Amino acid sequence: MNLKEKHIELNDEEIFYLDNESKSEKNILFIHGNMYSSSCFIEIIKELEDYHIFAPDMRGYGKSSYNNKITSIYDFVSDIKEFILRLDIKNFTLVSWSLGGGVALELARDKDIKDRIKNQIFLAPFGYAPFKTNGADILTNNFHEYLNNFDFINPQKNLEIIKGLMTFNMNLIEDSFASMGMTGTELKKDNIRVLFKTFIYNLKLPEKEEFERNVESAIRQRNLDEVAGILRDYKYHGGSLAMKSLVLHGYDDKIISYMDGKFLADEIGAKFEKLDNCGHSVMTDKKNLVIKNIKKFVEE
């Protein structure tokens, strides 16, 4: 695939992005998650050469600049909005992962952008609930919702969900971020590798080249503290989306509970698919399914 590395200046930042320079009028825009960059989508993009691909690194990630600190998720939204307008991307399928899902949700509400979005696919999206409280509080606040969605055929899964809610909280995220601030590049990389294997790739590891590429992306992140604030504070309040949307979420996600994905799908009027044997990296664990759904959405 002819995948070009490009830069565009906007909002006093230099935003890096991948562009396959396709002549197709069928466009796809990818928005990556936290600790990653556009490179996390490369293996998916390789299978989409018939379409015009745009995949930016958000401010403070990957090869993009970080001249101005972000103060909320809306700074990311502003950058991607300007990116879309400057490149005049129209009638596109928006594919987002994790933190990128929150950015995509807000773009879908923007008066200048929403009519440009053809449809959306959310992969393990962030946005239903902030990581402001610990797992026990989250479980208490949403107990009836969780109870209604329990798997009574496979009760062991419910115990795993509760355990995850009780133990995965903002302190864990911040500890992980702190480990990335350690001195010594190799030490940082070793900590990131452990973090990725434990929480992101808990079921299946990517090929070594892809795995190390993603480790390099994490090393490049410069907005750790600011993003931690976003994870604590952001919750989507925009109601149903105007465009067709799909949420794909792994049953074994250790970062964002698949139930949060379901609740978000209900809130935005999206179709929801719970994916068995799938963790947070939906692109890794269910690569073919992701590609199939993207092609289906683009061709509609």
Q: What do these predicted regions represent?
A:
Residues 1-28, 49-51, 85, 89-90, ...:
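Alpha/beta-hydrolase fold catalytic core
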Residues 20-65:
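Conserved HGGG/HGGXW glycine-rich cap/lid loop of the alpha/beta-hydrolase fold
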Residues 42, 55-99, 106, 112-114, ...:
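Active-site loop/oxyanion-hole signature of alpha/beta-hydrolase fold enzymes
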Residues 120-181:
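Flexible "cap/lid" loop of the alpha/beta hydrolase fold
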Residues 156-240:
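Conserved alpha/beta-hydrolase catalytic His-Asp/Glu region
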Residues 241, 247-249, 253:
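Short beta-strand/loop motif that positions the catalytic acidic residue
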Residues 254-260:
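Conserved alpha/beta-hydrolase "acid-adjacent" motif
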Residues 255, 278-291:
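Catalytic histidine-centered segment of alpha/beta-hydrolase-like enzymes
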